[in-house]
From Swiss-Prot:
Family annotation (Pfam families): RNase_HII
GO cellular component, one term: ribonuclease H2 complex
Keyword Metal-binding: yes
InterPro entries the record matches: RNase_HII, RNase_HII/HIII, RNase_HII/HIII_dom, RNaseH-like_sf, RNaseH_sf
Known role: Endonuclease that specifically degrades the RNA of RNA-DNA hybrids.
Entries under PROSITE patterns matching the protein: RNASE_H_2
Any one GO BP annotation for this protein: DNA replication, removal of RNA primer
Family designation: Belongs to the RNase HII family.
Chain's gene name: rnhB
The protein, known as: Ribonuclease HII
Keywords from the UniProt entry: Cytoplasm, Endonuclease, Hydrolase, Manganese, Metal-binding, Nuclease
Length: 196
Protein backbone atom coordinates (compact mmCIF):
# COMPACT_ATOMS: atom_id res chain seq x y z
CA UNK A 1 0.00 0.00 0.00
CA UNK A 2 1.28 3.44 -0.89
CA UNK A 3 0.51 6.77 0.71
CA UNK A 4 0.06 9.75 -1.57
CA UNK A 5 0.50 13.34 -0.44
CA UNK A 6 -1.50 16.07 -2.18
CA UNK A 7 -1.33 19.85 -2.05
CA UNK A 8 -2.25 22.74 -4.31
CA UNK A 9 -0.82 26.07 -5.31
CA UNK A 10 -2.64 29.04 -6.70
CA UNK A 11 -6.04 29.25 -5.05
CA UNK A 12 -5.78 32.96 -4.33
CA UNK A 13 -4.23 34.62 -7.40
CA UNK A 14 -6.20 36.73 -9.84
CA UNK A 15 -4.54 35.09 -12.83
CA UNK A 16 -3.24 31.72 -13.92
CA UNK A 17 -4.19 28.15 -13.16
CA UNK A 18 -4.62 26.30 -9.92
CA UNK A 19 -2.11 23.46 -9.74
CA UNK A 20 -2.21 20.38 -7.53
CA UNK A 21 0.59 17.88 -7.09
CA UNK A 22 0.50 14.31 -5.85
CA UNK A 23 3.63 12.58 -4.55
CA UNK A 24 4.61 9.12 -3.38
CA UNK A 25 7.82 9.57 -1.44
CA UNK A 26 10.89 7.50 -2.17
CA UNK A 27 12.97 5.81 0.52
CA UNK A 28 14.97 7.41 1.88
CA UNK A 29 12.96 10.55 1.33
CA UNK A 30 14.71 13.82 0.47
CA UNK A 31 15.82 15.61 3.61
CA UNK A 32 14.60 19.10 4.47
CA UNK A 33 11.01 18.74 3.27
CA UNK A 34 8.72 21.44 4.64
CA UNK A 35 5.82 23.63 3.65
CA UNK A 36 6.87 25.24 0.35
CA UNK A 37 5.96 28.69 1.69
CA UNK A 38 8.59 28.31 4.43
CA UNK A 39 11.42 27.46 2.04
CA UNK A 40 13.59 29.83 0.06
CA UNK A 41 13.22 29.76 -3.71
CA UNK A 42 16.66 28.17 -4.03
CA UNK A 43 15.85 25.44 -1.50
CA UNK A 44 12.48 24.74 -3.16
CA UNK A 45 14.16 24.37 -6.54
CA UNK A 46 16.76 22.02 -5.09
CA UNK A 47 14.12 19.88 -3.39
CA UNK A 48 11.91 19.88 -6.48
CA UNK A 49 14.76 18.41 -8.50
CA UNK A 50 15.38 15.70 -5.88
CA UNK A 51 11.69 14.84 -5.58
CA UNK A 52 11.23 14.65 -9.34
CA UNK A 53 14.35 12.55 -9.80
CA UNK A 54 13.76 10.06 -6.98
CA UNK A 55 10.04 9.96 -6.17
CA UNK A 56 6.86 9.36 -8.12
CA UNK A 57 4.81 12.48 -8.73
CA UNK A 58 2.22 14.06 -10.99
CA UNK A 59 0.45 17.38 -11.35
CA UNK A 60 -3.08 18.42 -12.21
CA UNK A 61 -3.64 21.84 -13.76
CA UNK A 62 -6.98 23.63 -14.03
CA UNK A 63 -7.01 26.74 -16.20
CA UNK A 64 -8.73 30.07 -15.42
CA UNK A 65 -11.76 29.49 -17.66
CA UNK A 66 -12.48 26.27 -15.79
CA UNK A 67 -11.89 28.03 -12.45
CA UNK A 68 -14.50 30.59 -13.47
CA UNK A 69 -16.92 27.84 -14.50
CA UNK A 70 -16.50 25.65 -11.41
CA UNK A 71 -15.40 28.22 -8.77
CA UNK A 72 -12.00 28.00 -7.11
CA UNK A 73 -13.01 25.30 -4.64
CA UNK A 74 -14.38 23.04 -7.37
CA UNK A 75 -11.34 23.72 -9.54
CA UNK A 76 -9.01 22.83 -6.68
CA UNK A 77 -10.84 19.56 -6.10
CA UNK A 78 -10.58 18.82 -9.83
CA UNK A 79 -6.84 19.63 -9.91
CA UNK A 80 -6.25 17.28 -6.97
CA UNK A 81 -8.26 14.54 -8.67
CA UNK A 82 -6.31 14.96 -11.91
CA UNK A 83 -2.98 14.83 -10.06
CA UNK A 84 -3.83 11.69 -8.09
CA UNK A 85 -5.28 10.01 -11.17
CA UNK A 86 -2.13 10.73 -13.17
CA UNK A 87 0.07 9.46 -10.35
CA UNK A 88 -1.95 6.27 -10.00
CA UNK A 89 -1.30 5.54 -13.67
CA UNK A 90 2.41 5.34 -12.75
CA UNK A 91 1.89 2.80 -9.96
CA UNK A 92 2.62 -0.86 -10.53
CA UNK A 93 -0.36 -3.18 -10.86
CA UNK A 94 0.33 -4.68 -7.44
CA UNK A 95 0.52 -1.29 -5.70
CA UNK A 96 -2.68 -0.13 -4.09
CA UNK A 97 -3.34 3.30 -2.69
CA UNK A 98 -3.64 2.96 1.07
CA UNK A 99 -4.48 6.57 1.70
CA UNK A 100 -4.30 10.00 0.11
CA UNK A 101 -3.26 12.68 2.58
CA UNK A 102 -4.59 16.07 1.52
CA UNK A 103 -3.46 19.40 2.90
CA UNK A 104 -6.41 21.29 4.33
CA UNK A 105 -9.73 20.45 5.93
CA UNK A 106 -11.51 18.95 2.90
CA UNK A 107 -10.74 16.37 0.24
CA UNK A 108 -12.23 15.63 -3.19
CA UNK A 109 -13.84 12.48 -1.74
CA UNK A 110 -17.58 12.84 -2.35
CA UNK A 111 -17.02 16.09 -4.25
CA UNK A 112 -15.60 14.72 -7.50
CA UNK A 113 -17.23 11.68 -9.10
CA UNK A 114 -13.85 10.48 -10.42
CA UNK A 115 -12.28 10.40 -6.94
CA UNK A 116 -12.02 6.77 -5.85
CA UNK A 117 -9.28 6.70 -3.21
CA UNK A 118 -9.42 6.76 0.58
CA UNK A 119 -8.54 10.28 1.66
CA UNK A 120 -7.75 12.11 4.87
CA UNK A 121 -7.55 15.89 5.20
CA UNK A 122 -4.79 17.28 7.41
CA UNK A 123 -4.92 20.94 8.36
CA UNK A 124 -1.38 22.28 8.08
CA UNK A 125 -0.38 19.00 6.47
CA UNK A 126 2.23 20.67 4.28
CA UNK A 127 4.27 21.27 7.44
CA UNK A 128 3.33 18.00 9.18
CA UNK A 129 3.42 15.22 6.58
CA UNK A 130 6.53 14.88 4.40
CA UNK A 131 4.57 13.52 1.43
CA UNK A 132 2.31 16.60 1.52
CA UNK A 133 5.38 18.84 1.91
CA UNK A 134 6.82 17.28 -1.23
CA UNK A 135 3.53 17.85 -3.06
CA UNK A 136 3.45 21.48 -1.94
CA UNK A 137 6.94 22.01 -3.36
CA UNK A 138 6.09 20.38 -6.70
CA UNK A 139 2.81 22.31 -7.01
CA UNK A 140 4.32 25.70 -6.17
CA UNK A 141 7.37 25.28 -8.39
CA UNK A 142 5.25 24.04 -11.30
CA UNK A 143 2.79 26.92 -11.01
CA UNK A 144 5.48 29.56 -10.54
CA UNK A 145 7.18 28.28 -13.70
CA UNK A 146 3.90 28.51 -15.63
CA UNK A 147 3.43 32.09 -14.46
CA UNK A 148 6.98 33.08 -15.42
CA UNK A 149 6.29 31.69 -18.90
CA UNK A 150 2.96 33.54 -19.06
CA UNK A 151 4.73 36.77 -18.07
CA UNK A 152 6.67 36.64 -21.33
CA UNK A 153 3.42 37.01 -23.28
CA UNK A 154 1.86 39.44 -20.79
CA UNK A 155 4.78 41.51 -19.42
CA UNK A 156 2.77 44.34 -17.83
CA UNK A 157 1.45 42.37 -14.85
CA UNK A 158 4.68 41.31 -13.12
CA UNK A 159 3.69 37.66 -12.94
CA UNK A 160 7.33 36.60 -12.83
CA UNK A 161 7.42 38.34 -9.44
CA UNK A 162 3.87 38.05 -8.08
CA UNK A 163 2.74 34.73 -9.64
CA UNK A 164 -0.63 36.29 -10.46
CA UNK A 165 -1.47 37.38 -6.92
CA UNK A 166 -3.21 40.72 -6.42
CA UNK A 167 -0.18 42.83 -5.59
CA UNK A 168 -0.31 46.61 -6.05
CA UNK A 169 1.79 46.21 -9.21
CA UNK A 170 -0.60 43.62 -10.65
CA UNK A 171 -3.72 45.60 -9.73
CA UNK A 172 -2.31 48.78 -11.29
CA UNK A 173 -1.50 46.92 -14.52
CA UNK A 174 -4.94 45.35 -14.51
CA UNK A 175 -6.55 48.79 -14.28
CA UNK A 176 -4.31 50.18 -17.02
CA UNK A 177 -4.24 47.25 -19.46
CA UNK A 178 -7.36 45.28 -18.57
CA UNK A 179 -7.62 41.54 -18.05
CA UNK A 180 -5.91 38.90 -20.17
CA UNK A 181 -7.30 35.47 -21.05
CA UNK A 182 -5.34 34.17 -18.04
CA UNK A 183 -7.24 36.35 -15.57
CA UNK A 184 -9.95 34.77 -13.47
CA UNK A 185 -13.05 36.71 -14.48
CA UNK A 186 -15.01 35.48 -11.47
CA UNK A 187 -12.53 36.95 -8.96
CA UNK A 188 -13.73 40.27 -7.55
CA UNK A 189 -10.91 42.62 -8.65
CA UNK A 190 -11.17 41.35 -12.23
CA UNK A 191 -14.98 41.16 -12.24
CA UNK A 192 -15.25 44.72 -10.91
CA UNK A 193 -13.11 46.03 -13.76
CA UNK A 194 -15.42 44.41 -16.26
CA UNK A 195 -18.34 46.37 -14.80
CA UNK A 196 -16.68 49.74 -15.41
Amino acid sequence: MVTIGVDEAGRGPLAGPVVAAAVVLCKPRPSGLDDSKKLSAARRAELEEKIKRRCRWAVGVVEPDEIDRLNIFGATMLAMTLAVGALCEQLAHDEDVGEVLVDGNLTPHGRRPEWCWPARPIVGGDALEPCISAASIIAKEHRDRLMREAALAHPHYGWERNAGYGTPEHLAALREHGPTPLHRRSFAPVAQLQLL
